[in-house]
Amino acid sequence: MSQEKYIMAIDQGTTSSRAIIFNQKGEKVSSSQKEFPQIFPHAGWVEHNANQIWNSVQSVIAGAFIESSIKPSQIEAIGITNQRETTVVWDKKTGVPIYNAIVWQSRQTAPIAEQLKQDGHTKMIHEKTGLVIDAYFSATKIRWILDHVPGAQERAEKGELLFGTIDTWLVWKLTDGAVHVTDYSNAARTMLYNIKDLTWDDEILELLNIPKDMLPEVKSNSEIYGKTAAFHFYGGEVPISGMAGDQQAALFGQLAFEPGMVKNTYGTGSFIIMNTGDEMQLSSNNLLTTIGYGINGKVHYALEGSIFIAGSAIQWLRDGLKMIETSPESEQFALASTSDDEVYVVPAFTGLGAPYWDSNARGSVFGLTRGTSKEDFVKATLQSIAYQVRDVIDTMQVDSGIDIQQLRVDGGAAMNNMLMQFQADILGIDIARAKNLETTALGAAFLAGLAVGYWEDMDALKELNATGQLFKASMNESRKEKLYKGWKRAVKATQVFTQEEDADDDAK
């Protein structure tokens, strides 16, 4: 009797690593999770030790096997999904990183990004990479490491150093240095990759003086990249055959295969991605153009809007203001509110993301009266998440010319029914919550499984992650627009407040 086969997804996130084993029905059979330390050398800097990331991945692979009694030989293929943009540079011979991994949120390279803007490169970089110039992306992080580690530039030019985002680093480690690759979705977040020509861009590399020899080969999101070295996978030589950045993996896990399909992951922040098909559409409204996924010789482009504060606004109510004891409690408080929704919280704690990209804005509250209760405040904070999502969805409709009919949702805060209902109401469209909320890991598993024939084709996947619950809009049009206009006024006032503060500082 042949043993049952499975797919393993490695989900390497910002604060923890997970390994999840899925069966042929797309069900989670086993999982293991391990946190690793965050390093904050200075205010605004965020780094990771790349070896600690690797150790945590080794640990969770073992944990998933131990929990399930599944053997490495029963794993048909491995899919990898990862925190995007985070940058590792290591020695090609020894495999030792020459500096900590610089994490996507880290602002230490902001002066390099600022200089690129001042030198007038915004348009060129946007047209080639689909991105805005920002410290968020890998390009400035590589430049910073080459500038700050003695001798690094010279070693890079001699071909002694390799660069990779976390997907590349993990494949390199799992294959014991045999394979140096990345995938379309991760390459598209480096600010070095021409997403139209599908090549590393020589003009941008020259501008930043980054040697091309450092860069990994770019492959599709679903193909066999290499096999695990037996001693790194507990005796198994298993194909690594699926790879995607976390938000693109969630798009795939949500089965958003058609142009116009949109998913939103309500995590710490909120990441909204729309499949725009084989057309690369540059945003005129500060959304990012990126690659959703490339499979079977075809690339699917996407528009992306990032909201910095979503689930973390609920954590703020819990940890900062002590208004609630647990995050799920926010739903009961919001339902107990008797206000007429006249309170607005603008959670711009670290600035405003898409479509505003206002890094100076700070949080504010409007519409308070003597009658405002804790319940009203909690409700307004939850509603702020939904309002921000509408800001992005409205912008996507303008940029793409596509009428969005449904939003597919996942992530922790998607479990809040009150928030999902209000999201449906304020957008005026259906919200489809996935039955399996592990969409990021599932997306990586699907990509890996397709490459080795574990699942026959993309149609076979459509049965595997059906909608768990559908929330339909029930608010009347005039109320919906009145509430949203109030939100737009609150955002405007927030921005004016900071601008005036900046003007006061300049006058001193």
UniProtKB/Swiss-Prot annotation:
Amino-acid positions noted as binding sn-glycerol 3-phosphate in the UniProt annotation, renumbered to this chain: T14, R84, E85, Y136, D246
Signal peptide per UniProt: none
One Gene Ontology term of the molecular function aspect: glycerol kinase activity
Binding site for ATP: T14, T15, S16, T268, G311, Q315, G412
UniProt EC number: 2.7.1.30
Positions of ADP binding: T14, R18, T268, G311, G412, N416
Annotated metabolic or biological route of this protein: Polyol metabolism; glycerol degradation via glycerol kinase pathway; sn-glycerol 3-phosphate from glycerol: step 1/1
Cellular component terms per the entry's GO annotation: cytosol
Group of enzyme by EC: transferase
Activity control note: Activated by phosphorylation and inhibited by fructose 1,6-bisphosphate (FBP).
Record function comment: Key enzyme in the regulation of glycerol uptake and metabolism. Catalyzes the phosphorylation of glycerol to yield sn-glycerol 3-phosphate.
Family, as annotated: Belongs to the FGGY kinase family.
Name assigned to this protein: Glycerol kinase
Gene: glpK
